[in-house]
Amino acid sequence: MKKLKCHCGEVVAEINLEKKIDELMRCNCSMCKRKGTIYKIIKKEDLKIIKGETKIKTYQFNTKVAKHYFCSECGSHTHNLRRSDPNTYGINMGCIDEIDANELFKFKINIRDGQNHPLDKK
């Protein structure tokens, strides 16, 4: 288990990252391109909020399927419920203190085409 934390430490989650860190992604939707977050997809049951549930705020837009979660104190985006698979979260790898952010760029980072998502309203 690893800890996923916002910048101020008010929101903390335990996450199960399975065996190794790979299959990282970035999304190019209008929200994610502004955040620039590197994500790892995990099953919903592999994330448990252990501190600050009342500090977590949600942002939704367009189809209002995906949910982008952030800390109401520091604004850190911690994770999101994915619209392409609502049984999974995209976790912000930058919120895991044990992982050096520079190490993330050594992995292949897949780009997901959120700009042309089939569920988007046309």
Regions found by a protein language model. Give the residues of each.
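A short Gly-Trp-Pro
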Residues: 1-5, 10-122
